[in-house]
Amino acid sequence: MKLLLLSVTMALAGCVSLSVPSFWDDNQSAAIVSVRQSIENINCAEPHAPQAADVQQRLRWFELYSESKGYAQQDVIRLVQPLKETVDDFARRSNEKQGSKTYCELKKSTLVDQASTAARAVLGRF
């Protein structure tokens, strides 16, 4: 009996560490596609700062909306964290000084990959 009780306790304790993914949300889906589109539209021949600011603002809307929905959205917020860090770095450096076209293209490539991954995850929820 003690062994059964111990086994049940251990099984339930293991379930506590599992997180339940958040569910589909139309607004989040539209917002992450908007972020992705603004990244795809970056033109490295043009000034980088305003383009980076646009991506930053769209991503911030996504974050604020997700935070406003509550704790259940923590998975989505963690999901876009790497993208946010890359966007913030691009915006900061672009505000300090216009980077080279090569720098922009490399940063854009990274952002495209990160945004694509985030969009697939957000749109793939049920």
Q: What spans do the regions from the language model cover?
A:
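Short, low-complexity, Pro/Ser/Thr/Gly-rich segments in the mature regions of secreted, periplasmic
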Residues: 107-126
